[in-house]
Swiss-Prot record:
Cofactor(s) the protein requires to work: Zn(2+)
Cofactor: record remark: Binds 1 zinc ion.
Record lineage: Bacteria, Pseudomonadati, Pseudomonadota, Alphaproteobacteria, Caulobacterales
Protein's name according to its UniProt entry: Transcriptional repressor NrdR
GO biological process: negative regulation of DNA-templated transcription
Zn-finger region bounds: unnamed: 3-34
Family in the record: Belongs to the NrdR family.
Transmembrane segments: none
């Protein structure tokens, strides 16, 4: 594995163990050139998934992009990062077990929304605001009412 610090082509594995949920192998590595230490995760990939965007463009499924988008939704919320990791692992397993090689981005988006709804209401609304492309505050109000998350108040924003 290439060193992320100096770019040296080789690194030594110093420690290897299963991750908390057992879905990955966590490896501590050290670069023999610069002495830099870093962590890598090794995961099983059952099949190559292609995501079909709304525009029709196709791109390989990127687990890290999913983690980042969920991370943005849960940022500064009292959500344990391990719960987020388990949630993402569950979504990836569901996607892989569908048996399809190409999936619409809407499938991923709906899975994330469903998982976030049970994890944290604020993260759910944050994600929905981007996924459903809210343009103004009335979009938020309508969504909150439809989802039963509104307190019923008609306050000016």
């Amino acid at each position: 594995m290439r060193c992320p610090f100096c770019g040296h082509a080789e690194s030594q594995v110093k420690d290897s163990r299963p991750s908390e949920d057992g879905a990955a192998i966590r490896r501590r590595r050290m670069c023999p050139e610069c002495g830099g230490r870093f962590t890598t995760f090794e995961r099983v990939q059952l099949r190559e998934l292609i995501i079909v965007k709304r525009s029709g463009r196709r791109s390989p499924f990127d687990r890290d992009k999913l983690v980042r988008s969920v991370g943005l939704a849960t940022q500064k919320r009292p959500v344990d990062p391990e719960r987020v990791e388990r949630m993402v692992n569950g979504i990836v397993r569901q996607l892989e077990s569908m048996g399809e090689t190409e999936l619409p981005s809407s499938t991923v988006g709906e899975m994330v929304m469903k998982a976030l709804k049970s994890l944290d209401d604020v993260a759910y609304v944050r994600y929905a605001s981007v996924y459903r492309d809210f343009k103004e505050t009335s979009d938020f109000a309508k969504f909150l009412t439809e989802e039963g998350l509104s307190d019923g108040g008609e306050e000016e924003l």
